[in-house]
Every structure is written in structure tokens, then in C-alpha cells.
Amino acid sequence: MRECISIHIGQAGIQVGNACWELYCLEHGIQPDGQMPSDKTVGGGDDAFNTFFSETGAGKHVPRAVFVDLEPTVIDEVRTGAYRQLFHPEQLISGKEDAANNFARGHYTIGKEIVDLCLDRIRKLADNCTGLQGFLVFNAVGGGTGSGLGSLLLERLSVDYGKKSKLGFTVYPSPQVSTSVVEPYNSVLSTHSLLEHTDVAVLLDNEAIYDICRRSLDIERPTYTNLNRLVSQVISSLTASLRFDGALNVDVTEFQTNLVPYPRIHFMLSSYAPVISAEKAYHEQLSVAEITNSAFEPSSMMAKCDPRHGKYMACCLMYRGDVVPKDVNAAVATIKTKRTIQFVDWCPTGFKCGINYQPPTVVPGGDLAKVQRAVCMISNSTSVAEVFSRIDHKFDLMYTKRAFVHWYVGEGMEEGEFSEAREDLAALEKDYEEVGAESGEGDEGDEEEY
């Protein structure tokens, strides 16, 4: 079996996690108490869904997941929510006092008291696997727990499970919408360890997803639930090939192989199509070509950065539902002929496709329409550098005045760590600039863009 363990850290990680597990349960027909009427083999079978759920002797399906937060309120919602019977109580780990939006508290003072407990639980889950494939880590880098405890856990996972791949789904601060003043500090400090300790990181950004909800689903005032349900569709499409059988299955390690040209260049953009409300879906014919095109639309990207400002290095298209390889090849051929979508000149093929016959499931009473086919795209584009340069700029404005730094130093950090992390990000921006540059120097003369 190729099991995956999901780790949800901090409020954002947990709330995205709730949406994901709700969707997985619906997709597999698992009830909120963990029973699965369709599953005839009692005890651990080697059905495809066992990559994400372990099975007890009593026929109950338990998610291979850990939820961690430094304060109890968000986890208490899981403990009392609709899916409270799904999770083993030991999988929900909460502390007493929160990280107060402070990376240093999450990483040093308060985080380190809880991290061994987390690793202990993760070890139990790992021992329960026959062939652990890797970890999916969900967190946000703007707050204190997601950034601080998140990077601490990633560092420790690298030590304990060196060869296992780690996929991060990371919520980055948005350009306009901010939830805390010290977001730029937390993000820069946290990205420093995301660079070292994740193999692929998918960037998400609330503002971009808000816009998608407003524009495509006509939700005037999207809530986090709306956002998370959209994100969960992306994550579900990525992991569908691990949980169902399909024509072209894609493994977690395959993402790495196909998307990451150099170890540091591993920050991905994601998009999903069709995002369409039920009223509209009746009147649209959502062919493979159409949904493929809309996945490449700059407005479909789930992070605020414009792929037209950069070049694609590779992209992974995961189709699900009523899709045949012939249609996919035709759609990809059309994309390649489009001048608007530019690839770097050293990567001629650039596409990895996966097809899964399980049609997309929607949450009843949710916003998305039930459709026959959908596509999720994960792409590695040099335009991701925009996200980093934006955060770096905000970081510099505060750090030149050393504003708020005493809160971090007071929790046992050294000022050198700030400049070290900042230099690391500056180097990352440079790396992106270099991979996007023409390999035959300056024959086209379009270096002015950067």
C-alpha cells in the first residue's frame, strides 16, 4: 500500500483539513461515524482508499491524519462537529495557549513543548502503514502556529523520515487582505524552512480564492467555508489517483519528479476548473478542451500572481470523470499552440497528465455544481516569484525599522535569523529569475520583463 499521512497545523490547516476529510468521506461513501456500508472486507483491506483511511477490526475507517494547534478552540470544533466520531481522539492535539501570531512562539517556546507529542502520534500512524509514501502538510505561514510549529514539524519530519516525500499546501498572505501585522515576518521565517524541508509546496492565497468565489460562483460575501471547499476540490483531485483506480494514475513522488526541475524551485501554482454554480451548469457544455483552457486562465490561479508575467517550467494536469486520453492530448496540443502560454525553452514537453475515472463529488448544499468532468492543474511557473517579492518588500519596510522584532527576540530568537531567512528568499527570487532567462543568452531580447 502507498499510504499518505496528512498533518494539519494551526487554524488554517485544520479548517482546510475539515473540508478535505468531509469531501473524502463523501467520495468514498464513508459515514461521519467512520462506517462504510459499501466496503465488504472487514479489517485492513488493500482497497485504494486505504491510502488515506486505516480500517479497524470493527469496520470503522479512521483518517490517517493529525490535527495540531497550540490553542484549543479550533480543534474543539472538530471534537464537537459532525465528524467527531471519525477521528481518534489522540489524533486531535491541542495546547493551552496560542502562538499569538508569533513565529518564535510557535517554533521555540510553545511549539517545542508539543512537538514531541505530535511526532509520537505521527509515528503511531506511520507504524500502522505498510508502505508509507509521504506526508501532506497543511498550514498557513501568516500566523504563529502554522508558520512556527509548521516549520518545526517539517524540520523534525526530515530527520525522522528523511526519504519520504513531503507535500505542503500552504496559505500565503494575500496582497490586499491581511489578518495580522507581522505576517511578512512569519512568512519569510517560515518559507526559509519550507525551502529546505518540503519537496513540493502548493501556494494558496485567500484573496485569489475569494475572487474566484465571487466571480465564478456569484457568492457576494464568501466565507472561509466557501474558500475551503474550493481548496478541498483541488486537494481531492490531486490525491484522487491515490484513492481510486484510474487510467493514468499519478503518485505523490511523481509530482516531484515531473514538477521540480531544481530542488529549490518547488513552489507551485494551482487552479481548478470548472468552478461553476449549479444555475449556470445546465447551460454550459464543459468539454475537456474548455475546462483545460479555463484552468490556464490567469484568473483561475489560486494564488495572486499572473502566469503571463513568467514562463511555465512544467505543469501537471489531473483530470477526473468522463475523460479519455484522446481528448486530453487534443486539449494539450491546443494549449501548446497558444502564444499566451509560454514555456521555458529548456523544457520542451512540459506536461504531465493524469486521468481518474471517478467523477468529481460535490458537498450537498455546497456552491459548486455537480459536473461530469473536472481538471486540476498544478504548475511550476517563474511568476511565483511575484508572491515572494511582495512579501519580501513588506518584510523590508518593517525590518529596516526593526519594528515588532523584540517580540521575536523575547521568545528566544536571534536577530540573525531574520536576516538569514531574508537572504535565503532573496536568493530564491534570483533563482527564479535565472531559470526564466533564455538559455541561448539574449537571442530574443526579452530580458527587459524581469
Curated annotation (Swiss-Prot):
Subcellular localization(s) per the UniProt record: Cytoplasm, Cytoskeleton
Biological processes per GO annotation: microtubule cytoskeleton organization; mitotic cell cycle
Annotated site, Involved in polymerization, chain positions: 450
Cited CDD domains: alpha_tubulin (cd02186)
Molecular function terms, GO-annotated: GTP binding; hydrolase activity; metal ion binding; structural constituent of cytoskeleton
Top-rank EC class of the record's enzyme: hydrolase
Annotated catalytic residues: 254
Positions of Mg(2+) binding: 71
Residues at which GTP binds: 11, 71, 144-145, 179, 206, 228
PTM characteristics: Undergoes a tyrosination/detyrosination cycle, the cyclic removal and re-addition of a C-terminal tyrosine residue by the enzymes tubulin tyrosine carboxypeptidase (TTCP) and tubulin tyrosine ligase (TTL), respectively. Acetylation of alpha chains at Lys-40 stabilizes microtubules and affects affinity and processivity of microtubule motors. This modification has a role in multiple cellular functions, ranging from cell motility, cell cycle progression or cell differentiation to intracellular trafficking and signaling.
Xref: InterPro entries: Alpha_tubulin (IPR002452), Tub_FtsZ_C (IPR008280), Tubulin (IPR000217), Tubulin/FtsZ-like_C (IPR037103), Tubulin/FtsZ_2-layer-sand-dom (IPR018316), Tubulin/FtsZ_GTPase_sf (IPR036525), Tubulin_C (IPR023123), Tubulin_CS (IPR017975)
Catalytic reaction list: GTP + H2O = GDP + phosphate + H(+)
GO cellular component terms listed in the entry, alphabetical order: cytoplasm; microtubule
Cofactor(s) it depends on: Mg(2+)
SUPFAM superfamilies, sorted: Tubulin C-terminal domain-like (SSF55307), Tubulin nucleotide-binding domain-like (SSF52490)
Region of interest (Disordered), residue spans: 431-450
Subunit structure of this chain's protein: Dimer of alpha and beta chains. A typical microtubule is a hollow water-filled tube with an outer diameter of 25 nm and an inner diameter of 15 nM. Alpha-beta heterodimers associate head-to-tail to form protofilaments running lengthwise along the microtubule wall with the beta-tubulin subunit facing the microtubule plus end conferring a structural polarity. Microtubules usually have 13 protofilaments but different protofilament numbers can be found in some organisms and specialized cells.
Purpose of the protein: Tubulin is the major constituent of microtubules, a cylinder consisting of laterally associated linear protofilaments composed of alpha- and beta-tubulin heterodimers. Microtubules grow by the addition of GTP-tubulin dimers to the microtubule end, where a stabilizing cap forms. Below the cap, tubulin dimers are in GDP-bound state, owing to GTPase activity of alpha-tubulin.
Homology family: Belongs to the tubulin family.
Protein name in UniProt: Tubulin alpha-4 chain
Organism expressing this protein natively: Gossypium hirsutum (Upland cotton)
Native organism taxonomy: Eukaryota, Viridiplantae, Streptophyta, Embryophyta, Tracheophyta
